[in-house]
A protein has these predicted regions:
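Cytoplasmic-side transmembrane-helix entry/capping segments in multi-pass membrane proteins
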Residues: 72-84, 137
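Helix-coil boundary and interhelical linker segments in multi-pass alpha-helical membrane proteins
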Residues: 1-3, 29-49, 89-105, 154-162
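The first (N-terminal) embedded transmembrane alpha-helix
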Residues: 6, 12-30
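Mid-bilayer segments of alpha-helical transmembrane spans in multi-pass integral membrane proteins
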Residues: 84-93, 102-123, 145
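The feature identifies polytopic integral membrane transport proteins across all domains of life
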Residues: 102-107, 127-139
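Helical membrane-embedded segments and adjacent short helical loop/helix-boundary regions
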Residues: 15-19, 42-54, 78-83
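Generic transmembrane alpha-helix signature in multi-pass membrane proteins
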Residues: 10, 88-94, 120-126, 140, ...
């Protein structure tokens, strides 16, 4: 039970940086490992269609997030998507654990992804203004890297999430 909660929380936080990386990591972990088992309706995430859709959305997100100015518009739009993705990964990670209230996981996913997203959305314009947008692609790549690493930690070493 604790592992599922930590995995859910650990996936929700990076969803605030990039909605699709934690979802894709969760889907691939369900398909390729025994670390996560998604139960209905969340098993749709790891279906062939789900994975293809996540790869497509991730590709768009990665490309758009590297362009100064466009990245800010994307961040505003994604301010609704990222917290929702945080909720989905938190719920999906704990869907097989009966003793966890879904309401707690909804709140966990919303707060963690929403908080991380709020920091991203408010700090990005400062990078754009301060550097004329030159650093935006590098900041975006760093965010993507952090999202990948923290998502993998949440799946494979969930107790590190509390650090």
């Amino acid at each position: 039970m604790e592992t599922a909660i930590l995995t859910g929380a650990g996936l929700a936080a990076p969803a605030g940086l990039n909605a699709y990386i934690p979802l894709l990591v969760l889907a691939l972990a369900d398909r390729a490992t025994d670390r996560v088992t998604l139960h209905g309706p969340y098993d749709a995430i790891s279906s062939n269609v789900g994975i293809v859709l996540l790869v497509l959305l991730l590709s768009i997100e990665i490309a758009v997030d590297k362009v100064p100015g466009v990245d800010h518009i994307n961040d505003i739009i994604q301010s609704f998507v990222r917290p929702a993705a945080g909720v989905i990964v938190a719920l999906a990670s704990t869907s097989g654990v009966v003793s966890i209230s879904p309401a707690i996981m909804v709140l966990t996913g919303l707060v963690l992804a929403g908080s991380v997203n709020a920091v991203k959305v408010t700090s990005r314009p400062a990078f754009t203004f301060g550097t004329g947008g030159i650093l935006n692609p590098f900041v975006s790549m760093a965010e993507d890297g952090i999202a990948v690493v923290t998502s993998l930690i949440a799946i494979f070493v969930p107790f590190l999430v509390i650090l």
